[in-house]
Amino acid sequence: MHRYSYYKTAACTLNVSIGDPQANKEEILKCIQELDSDTQLVVFPELCITGYTCQDLFYEHTLLNSAKQVLFEIVEELPENLVTVIGLPLEIENKLYNCAAICFNHDILGIQVKTYIPSYNEFYETRWFSSASELKENTTFTYKNKKVPVSNHIVFKDTTTSACLGIEICEDLWVTIPVSSTHALAGANVLCNLSASNEIISKANYRRNLVKDQSAKCYAGYVYASAGPTESSSDLVFSGHNLICENGAILNETKTDKIIYGQIDLDHLNHDRLHYKTSMQDLFHVNYTTVEFTSKPIEEIEFDRYIDAYPFVPNNQDERIVRCLEILHIQAQGLATRLSKIHCKDVVIGISGGLDSTLALLVCHEAFKINNYDSKGIHAITMPGFGTTKRTKSNAQILMDLLHVSSEEISIVDGVNQHFKDIHHDPEVHNITYENSQARERTQILMDLSNAYNAIVVGTGDLSELALGWCTYNGDHMSMYAVNASVPKTLVRYIEIGRASCRERV
């Protein structure tokens, strides 16, 4: 796991017993025993040691003392090398706080305190809890004669992996500037939320988008663990909606299991943070405490993360068509603007019958419609060579006829054979010289025709080819305007299909 930068996280929902910390301790430990052995972080729901719906029982010192004692007992029984985040109420200097204890290797690393205490609609937490903003500076909590920091401005940095954890509690996410945002600015790349989010109509979808979008804004992983249906249903219902997201993508979401896992790619997140520097500019200048801990590297991993072979292609057909048409419009608008700026009404494009040149021709056609140009100004040139098949040649001609563009066929065979004689190359030797000579001959034809027509050459190469260097230097890598340069190969076909689908619907 360390070697591949993946950090395995889990979110758990408990069968909670209201006001019974001992019973909840057994449930927490049972869940931990069920975790996969390579799990590095587990997050439990808000106030899970007591239950979220204790209401005025939170005033009882018997419950509060029992909750604190149970926390100590859980810490002693935790397995090695597992960061465990547990919710409980804590009385500190005659005030009650909604807290999360961050535990590791039989120790409490710190106490994160809830900042935003809701008191609206179905929530009335201010009846019992104080905000972290009421904490005195440098407040601590004693465990084993050690002073543990208590704050809402703490991050927990693993010196072995590149994981840096930031914790927030339920409502802290739902406000204008979430606590996790300042955590991210302080370096946290794995954000955890202990929640007790109830169910009302459409709230699940809003919550899903909230967690997903926050992970994107913070360039972070986000582990969201919520209270489940065994909380009191006197006036609220909880479903245990757990989510694990990464940089705007949902890695896992509760279906039926009470435990979900997500492998967060820390290297990817850290790379994005280096790249998008403006998002990491801290304008708040909040003083943070960084608590360091050292985990053991996990060498054996069972990789179960889904990797999409077509990351740029939406699975939903309607969404895919909308995206592809949007891309086509962006391409066409770019070319249309360039043609308008240089006062040019003619383009030259090489057509092979393949995907890339087909898309480029469609882009030219759309651009000419935007500028209200005559499509005959699109000079589509087919240049058959030694390897041209009847099928690709036929496809190219059909497309050009359908679009009513100017078409012309120029064979490169004689020109390339003469070139082989000039450079003393045997045409029976099919090496790189044989291949590149044909590509350069085609480019020469296109460039010369662009001069003849007072036009520009439109390039057809796509992003994948450019990234891999899959083009001929001084050949098809050259053009005046390359419309496919930002389109990956896996998306090209779908843009063409999307345009065709749209035409059929109209």
Residue ranges with predicted function:
Residues 217-218, 338-345, 366-378, 388, ...:
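Secondary-structure transition/capping motifs at alpha-helix termini
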Residues 261, 292-310, 373, 377-431, ...:
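A conserved beta-strand->alpha-helix junction
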